[in-house]
């Protein structure tokens, strides 16, 4: 990705990529927790998007690629994933790049469902 990572006093690093991909990295004791904003989402939107979210969540879980979570206070859908091996810089960069690519793909897919 070629970006320097700077963590704040809360051990969090915020990234804005391509002007619309927002990702945060939270450094915990032995993991990095990645949070990526997918779409703003009203809790009363149609059933079809919630069904699609559950289908995608099952696929993510089966492939150990994170999980989708709804943040009620922000009315936002997030992709969350933990990087557990912090000993290999190449592995960290690879997982971060995969996460951002997954985040972008999910955003594109679910934006279409949100329009329906």
UniProtKB/Swiss-Prot annotation:
The keyword Transcription regulation does not apply. Keywords: Chaperone, Cytoplasm, Virulence. It is found in: Cytoplasm. The keyword Chaperone applies. Transmembrane segments: none annotated. SUPFAM superfamilies: Type III secretory system chaperone-like. GO terms for biological process: protein secretion by the type III secretion system. InterPro entries: SicP (IPR044530), Tir_chaperone (IPR010261). Pfam families: CesT. The structure of the SptP-SicP complex contains four molecules of the chaperone SicP, aligned in a linear fashion and arranged in two sets of tightly bound homodimers that bind two SptP molecules. The SicP homodimers do not interact with each other, but are held together by a molecular interface formed between two SptP molecules. The chaperone-binding domain of SptP does not adopt a globular fold for interaction with SicP. Each SptP molecule is wrapped around by three SicP chaperones (two chaperones from one homodimer and a third one from the opposite homodimer pair). Belongs to the SicP family. This is Chaperone protein SicP. It comes from Salmonella typhimurium (strain LT2 / SGSC1412 / ATCC 700720). The lineage of its organism: Bacteria, Pseudomonadati, Pseudomonadota, Gammaproteobacteria, Enterobacterales. The gene is sicP.
